[in-house]
Swiss-Prot record:
GO terms for molecular function: DNA-binding transcription factor activity; sequence-specific DNA binding. Keywords: DNA-binding, Nucleus, Transcription, Transcription regulation. It comes from Xenopus tropicalis (Western clawed frog). Disulfide bonds: none annotated. Residues 106-200 bind DNA. Residues 1-25, 191-255 are annotated as: Disordered. This is Forkhead box protein I1c. The lineage of its organism: Eukaryota, Metazoa, Chordata, Craniata, Vertebrata.
Length: 358
């Protein structure tokens, strides 16, 4: 069988195959013969115009694979596919050397880690700023080629990071600039070039807590009087003491030091008691009405004078039946759900109840 006369041979043999085989088997057999002969012809003449039919072969195969250049199941694993396509697409890996990759790829180290590596590799464990620049440029070609301001970043890290200490130059040592050394307490923070910032934050937080504890211990001795106990750290005024004795608030000592917060929480406590009183019997409402009014008086000064006006306005409704006032009050209580609205609805019930009893 000659590969040159292959199309004419397929055209002559196609009717015979179509009579004895179904259409799917005919296409599979013809495609297999065409692929084998095309691979032989493709090894001899590798031109760009002949690559298009080879991509089309993969489309007609049953398990289609979009990655045709990887020699998957969708393409026949012939030597021509592995040598021509894979070799040309991935040939840049053989050209690029390790040094060229290092010039392109940025090293996975922070500027603080680069400074620490430079100082640790120095014989005397100290370097000047120019020597740190030289170490980074010599060991990492990316920074030698790049001009993105990495020297400014290194200079800022030296001045802002507490792990790097500035050492003045000796008088007998000629040259410019001071030396930079690494703090011995921070040597464990650098693990294989990676700077562990979490440990530094924990040490700073522990030292800050120790300073605050010392300040609190010395505060009573400086500002406290001789007759006061050392446990009393927050000052108290006579107004706050009278308010706490009269209302018996359960708020903590740190909150009661502010008069505004004291009045606010006492009014909120009175609002909570009114929500409980709403669920009690109507016979106890008259006894608790004065407490509710005094609780609202701490919240605002105008809320005490308003019920007297409501009493005069509600005098017109005293002749209503008791069951009608009860139904209207039940509807009002179901309409409002918050503590603020419950307080005023309970007060309106109080006045309506007093009018019905009279």
């Amino acid at each position: 069988m000659n590969s040159i006369h292959l199309p004419s041979h397929q055209r002559t043999s196609a009717p015979g195959l179509h009579q004895h085989r179904p259409k799917g088997a005919q296409e599979a057999s013809e495609m297999a013969v065409y692929c084998d002969n095309f691979s032989m012809y493709h090894q001899q003449n590798l031109h760009s115009s002949q690559r298009a039919p080879n991509y089309g072969i993969g489309d007609y195969a049953p398990p289609t694979n979009p990655y045709l250049w990887l020699g998957g199941p969708g393409v026949s694993n012939s030597p021509s596919n592995s040598s021509s396509f894979c070799g040309t697409d991935l040939s840049w890996l053989s050209v690029a050397s390790q040094e060229e990759l290092l010039k392109v790829v940025r090293p996975p180290y922070s500027y603080s880690a680069l400074i620490a590596m430079a100082i640790q590799n120095a014989p005397e464990k100290k370097l000047t700023l120019s020597q740190i620049y030289q170490y980074v440029a010599d060991n990492f070609p990316f920074y030698k080629r790049s001009k993105a301001g990495w020297q400014n970043s290194i200079r800022h890290n030296l001045s802002l990071n507490d792990c790097f200490k500035k050492v003045p130059r000796d008088e007998d040592d000629p040259g410019k600039g001071n030396y930079w050394t690494l703090d011995p307490n921070c040597e464990k923070m650098f693990d294989n070039g990676n700077f562990r910032r979490k440990r530094k934050r924990r040490s700073d937080s522990s030292s800050a807590e120790a300073v605050t504890v010392k300040g609190e211990e010395g505060r009573p001795a400086l500002g406290g009087k001789g007759g006061e106990s050392p446990l009393m750290l927050t000052p108290s005024s006579p107004e706050l003491e009278a308010a706490s004795d009269g209302r018996k608030s359960t708020s903590p000592s740190g909150i009661t030091s502010s008069p505004c917060l004291n009045n606010f929480f006492s009014s909120m406590t009175s609002l909570d008691t009114t929500s409980v009183n709403r669920q009690m019997s109507m016979g106890l409402v008259n006894e608790l009405s004065q407490r509710n009014i005094t609780g609202l008086g701490s919240f605002t000064s105008g809320s005490v004078a308003e019920p007297s006006v409501d009493l005069q306005d509600n005098s017109l409704h005293l002749n209503r039946p008791s069951y009608y006032s009860t139904l209207s009050s039940t509807h009002q209580n179901n309409q409002f759900n918050s503590h603020f609205y419950n307080t005023f609805s309970v007060n309106s019930l109080i006045y309506a109840r007093e009018g019905s009893e009279v």
